Amino acid sequence: MTFSVDKVRADFPVLSREVNGLPLAYLDSAASAQKPSQVIDAEAEFYRHGYAAVHRGIHTLSAQATEKMENVRKRASLFINARSAEELVFVRGTTEGINLVANSWGNSNVRAGDNIIISQMEHHANIVPWQMLCARVGAELRVIPLNPDGTLQLEMLPNLFDEKTRLLAITHVSNVLGTENPLAEMITLAHQHGAKVLVDGAQAVMHHPVDVQALDCDFYVFSGHKLYGPTGIGILYVKEALLQEMPPWEGGGSMIATVSLSEGTTWTKAPWRFEAGTPNTGGIIGLGAALEYVSALGLNNIAEYEQNLMHYALSQLESVPDLTLYGPQNRLGVIAFNLGKHHAYDVGSFLDNYGIAVRTGHHCAMPLMAYYNVPAMCRASLAMYNTHEEVDRLVTGLQRIHRLLG
């Protein structure tokens, strides 16, 4: 299938709107991606004609809704090449998925004197849950340091592992720098030391194929809203043997086998014992539509288009005076920058006046900001619906801001 950005853009209603009297150039998909009509329509159709509470209902609507929900679990398992759909837990997003692992697997397997390894480029969602776990149990949090070019000091990693290392929690792709970490060698090293590996895939799954069996990671988590799906839904993958051993971290309906006031409660099997309460079924249906949409386009086709666009953007940005770029030359999805000594918020506000949407701030990565000794950065993210013309508008906008502000 030939990739056509014009055809893709036609599927996204919001891309036809104007902002401040100018066509919208949406360069903030790393924060949250826009939704195609196919996703919007699938969720709306479910609420119009097929909504019911899932599980245990004997009536037709309930049975059909349950089947649709479980079919999305199967589709998601194929999307990341999991061995079984029963290795996938529906969560609200990447943040909840990581917290689930920290509170279930972590509470059961990390003890005083143990250690967990993360990196200096992590999103707060892959830092704070491990800080909280370490504080609860008396474990140590170890950190892989950054290089100035935005890659990790991987030569330091072997020295961080010892017999007390229980987990390596690492991002697949940095949400600020676009750095894609060499997961295969990192996972192999962790397993050689008897440690498990959690991968934060929030910034990876929309850019190229992910194969969790080939990676051999123990946990992989991502959000639907960055993958052109709805908010409030995500996927946590856990190797089946691990998942079956993990205790639930939330109690309620749907996750029990039996409940007795005198004899206590027993749990249903995984993954359902991690899905307490009424699920976000509409969001799950929308996620299924997003997975179908992206799969039909072909992730390899998307990757080729986006990489060409990224190379173009990096080359064109060289023409902007006093622009500082952060991150390696080979990157996925995002370009973080600052313009002279101007605060990122000011630059972002000017760009918004030109109809260009970028993200500004610390990007939930304060340790990374501290490493570069800046309070904030601007971040332009490139998705499959962005164009060379939008890149040109960004470059022209930055040149104009430089002339205005000096």
From Swiss-Prot:
It catalyses: (sulfur carrier)-H + L-cysteine = (sulfur carrier)-SH + L-alanine; L-selenocysteine + AH2 = hydrogenselenide + L-alanine + A + H(+). InterPro entries: Aminotrans_V_dom, Aminotrans_V_PyrdxlP_BS, Cys_dSase_SufS, PyrdxlP-dep_Trfase, PyrdxlP-dep_Trfase_major, PyrdxlP-dep_Trfase_small. Its EC number is 2.8.1.7, 4.4.1.16. GO terms for cellular component: cytoplasm. Keywords: Cytoplasm, Lyase, Pyridoxal phosphate, Transferase. Its main location: cytoplasm. The keyword Cytoplasm applies. It comes from the Bacteria. The modification N6-(pyridoxal phosphate)lysine is found at residue 226. GO terms for molecular function: cysteine desulfurase activity; pyridoxal phosphate binding; selenocysteine lyase activity. It is found in: Cytoplasm. Pathway: Cofactor biosynthesis; iron-sulfur cluster biosynthesis. Its cofactor is pyridoxal 5'-phosphate. The keyword Transferase applies. SUPFAM superfamilies: PLP-dependent transferases. The active site is at 364 (cysteine persulfide intermediate). One of its GO terms (biological process) is cysteine metabolic process. Cysteine desulfurases mobilize the sulfur from L-cysteine to yield L-alanine, an essential step in sulfur metabolism for biosynthesis of a variety of sulfur-containing biomolecules. Component of the suf operon, which is activated and required under specific conditions such as oxidative stress and iron limitation. Acts as a potent selenocysteine lyase in vitro, that mobilizes selenium from L-selenocysteine. Selenocysteine lyase activity is however unsure in vivo. HAMAP family: SufS_aminotrans_5. Belongs to the class-V pyridoxal-phosphate-dependent aminotransferase family. Csd subfamily. This is Cysteine desulfurase. The lineage of its organism: Bacteria, Pseudomonadati, Pseudomonadota, Gammaproteobacteria, Enterobacterales. The gene is sufS.
